[in-house]
């Protein structure tokens, strides 16, 4: 291949690859909470990426209480963000669950499972962590969903 042919090949290849670059616009869902620089979710194409949700209620106050209280608040928060993004739990494909206590694992599974159709659960990672950003957080969950 001559030098000119190599240059032409490189130009054509790079132009083709550049044309395939993902240029989908990003849509940011939700306002930053309590001055933290994070969106509740980001939509791109047919995907929705939901930030980790703690147990804040609609007034921005932590749902103080036992684990079931916090777990239900987190799941309700995620439900609201998914709805705002145009999707729901039936379209969630992946979740990441962070728990601060191993003793909450069974209760987490019980409540978590109630949000899905039996046998149609998303992929999930559950991790036990030493702590979360607020000392009273018992858990945090993030998820990824797709749009119709």
Indicate residue ranges for each PLM-predicted region.
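N-terminal secretory signal peptides that target proteins for export/translocation
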Residues: 1-3
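N-terminal presequence-like segments and the immediate start of the first folded domain
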Residues: 5-76, 80-93, 99-148
